[in-house]
UniProtKB/Swiss-Prot annotation:
The protein's name: Angiotensin-converting enzyme 2
Organism whose genome encodes this protein: Mus musculus
Domain Peptidase M2: residue ranges: 19-607
Biased composition (Polar residues): 793-805
Listed Pfam families: Collectrin (PF16959), Peptidase_M2 (PF01401)
Amino acid sequence: MSSSSWLLLSLVAVTTAQSLTEENAKTFLNNFNQEAEDLSYQSSLASWNYNTNITEENAQKMSEAAAKWSAFYEEQSKTAQSFSLQEIQTPIIKRQLQALQQSGSSALSADKNKQLNTILNTMSTIYSTGKVCNPKNPQECLLLEPGLDEIMATSTDYNSRLWAWEGWRAEVGKQLRPLYEEYVVLKNEMARANNYNDYGDYWRGDYEAEGADGYNYNRNQLIEDVERTFAEIKPLYEHLHAYVRRKLMDTYPSYISPTGCLPAHLLGDMWGRFWTNLYPLTVPFAQKPNIDVTDAMMNQGWDAERIFQEAEKFFVSVGLPHMTQGFWANSMLTEPADGRKVVCHPTAWDLGHGDFRIKMCTKVTMDNFLTAHHEMGHIQYDMAYARQPFLLRNGANEGFHEAVGEIMSLSAATPKHLKSIGLLPSDFQEDSETEINFLLKQALTIVGTLPFTYMLEKWRWMVFRGEIPKEQWMKKWWEMKREIVGVVEPLPHDETYCDPASLFHVSNDYSFIRYYTRTIYQFQFQEALCQAAKYNGSLHKCDISNSTEAGQKLLKMLSLGNSEPWTKALENVVGARNMDVKPLLNYFQPLFDWLKEQNRNSFVGWNTEWSPYADQSIKVRISLKSALGANAYEWTNNEMFLFRSSVAYAMRKYFSIIKNQTVPFLEEDVRVSDLKPRVSFYFFVTSPQNVSDVIPRSEVEDAIRMSRGRINDVFGLNDNSLEFLGIHPTLEPPYQPPVTIWLIIFGVVMALVVVGIIILIVTGIKGRKKKNETKREENPYDSMDIGKGESNAGFQNSDDAQTSF
C-alpha cells in the first residue's frame, strides 16, 4: 500500500474518531441541558424565596437546593473534562464544554464548599438585616433600605450623614470582616483548583475570547484596557470633582477643603458610588426648569407599577418583546407591607423555564425610573438568548449584560423623551443652559462612578493576589480612595472594619469591573444604535425610542448570548472589537468645555494629605529604643489598644473632675490615623455613641495633662519618649502667671528706675561728705600700704559698707 493511501486512511481514522467524540459530546450536552435546567430552577427559586423572605427556614432550603445543584454540576463537570477540546470542531459544542469544564466552587471539597456557602449566606443576611440606631434617639433603628438610604440621598446635615455612614460600617462592616477574610481564602483556593492564579484572575476570565481572525482576547488585556481608558477619562473626572467640591463648600463651608479630597459621606449615597443626589446642590442654572422629574412623577400619581409599565413601553417601541405574564405576577416591585425582611437591592432574575422576575423596593423617583429601565434591560437580554443551550444563556461578557439597560436609560433620561411621556411640560424649551444642566446630571451618575468602580476592583484584585496583607486592608483601601478617587474618610478606620464589604456587590460575591466596562460599552452601543435610527445630532440628545431599526440591531446581538466571542458580538453592533472611550467623551464634550471654563480660578486635582478631622487631631511620637534600649518592645495592635484605652481613661477622669460629668469613654472613641512604622500617629476623640460629636482638641489636651504621668507609666516611658506634640511636657499644666506679662515687665522697669534714683542720691551724699573731710587734719594712717587689700573695719564708714542690691 502506498504512503499516500496510509495517509488517507490515517486521516479517515482521525476524522472518524473526532466525529464519534463530537457526537458523544453532543449527546452528553443534550442530557445535561435537560437535567440542569430543572435543578438550576429549583435552586434559583429557593434563592428567590430567601431574598424575598429572609428566614432561617428559607435559608436552610436555599442551602439544600444549592447543594443539590452543586453536586450535580460537579459530577457533570468531571465528565465534561474527559472530552478533549482538540477533538471538537463545532464551535458551539466546544464553547459549552469549555464552560462546563470549569467546575467553579465544586472544585472545593464538600466540607469547604459547604463552608463557603455558609459564609456567603451569612454575609448576605448581615447585609440585608443590619440596622443602625440614631445616637440622638436610640429607639430609632434603621435598615439600609428603606431608612439609611433616605438620609444619604436627601439630608444636608453633616452630622446626620456622618452617624449613618459610620454606623453602617461599624454595625455591618465589622461583622463582615472575619467572614470576608475566610471568603478570600476559600475563593482563591477555588480559583486555583480551576487553573487560575487567584479569584480576581478567575473573574477576569469572563472576558477571555477565542476565535479566528483577531477575535482573541485574554484576561490580562482587560487590565490594560481598563488602565488605558481610565487615563483618558481622568481629566474629565478631575474637572467634575473640582466643580462639585466648590459647590459643596456652599453647603458644608466648615468641612470642605478647596484643594482637598471630598469627605466620603457627603457624596449622594451610602458609598459615594453615584453622585446623582448631589444634583440639587450643584445644578449650574437653578433658574431653569428642573430636569429631575421626581416631583412631576409624584404630582401625577405615579407608582412602582407605572414606572415599570413605562419602561416596558420603551422596549416595545423599539421592537423588543413585552414582559411575560409571570413577570408581572411574580416580581417583587415594592417593599412588602407584611413585615417580611427582604433584600431590597434591585436585581433581575432569570430563574429558568421562562420565569423572569425583578426584585426591587421601588420608590417614585427619577433615579428609580432609570433603574427600572436598567433592570428590565437585563430581562430583555435573558429573554433574547433563552433559546440558546443552557450553558450559553449569558451575556457575551458580564459588562454587556449591564450595558443593555444603560443604553435605554441614556435615551429615557433625555428631555425629549421625558417630554414625550408627560414628565416635562409641553412648553419645555431646550437651550445651552438646560443642556449643561442635563449633562451635569448625567455626569454625576456616569462619570462620577467610574473612579469608584475602578478603584474598588483594583483593590480586590490586589487582595486576591496577596499584594495587600489583611493587616493593611483598610489602610490601603483609604490610601487608594484618596489617590485615585479624590475621596477621604470622614473618620479613620482601623483593621476591625471591612468598608468594601459594606457594598452589596462585595458582600454578595459579584465581580465589580462589569460596571466599569459596561459604561464604556453603553456609549459605543448608543452611538451605533443612534446611527441605525438615522439620528443626526449631538449624541447626548439622541433618543432611540420608537426606532425598530435600532431595536433589531440590538436584538440580533442579544440573541447570541454567549455563543460567540464578545469581541465579535461587539463588532457586529459597533464595528470595533475593543473598548473605546471616545463615544463617552464625545457625549460629555460640551460639559467638559464648560467645566474647564468654570474651574479657571479653582484648584483642579486634590491634596491627599488633608482630612476633615485634621484640626482636632493630636500627633503622638514614641521613641521606644532610645528610651528603653535593649528592653524596647514592639509597638503592636495590642499596644495601640492600650494607648487608646489610656486616653479613654484620661477623658473619663477629666470629665468627672473638671466637668462633674460621668461619660463612659471607651477605646473605640479614640480615633487613630496615619500610623507610621517609626511609631508616630494622630488621634482625636469622639463622644461615646455619637461619632458626629468630636471632643474639642483643647479639652483632650487638658485631659492628657491631667493624666500624663499615668499614661507614661503604662508604657514605661517619659515625656520625652512619649511625646504629645503641642502639649507641654510636664505632669502639671504649663505655669500660668497670676498677672499678665506686660504688667510684670512694667513692674521690673519701674523697680530699676527707683533703684537708679536711690543710687544717685546715695552717691551725692557720699560726695558731700568727702569734701567736708578734706578740711580736717591729715589722717595718721595715710602711710599704711593698703595695696595688699588690708583695711580696718573699725574705721569703715557705715555708708560705704557693701550691700547687695
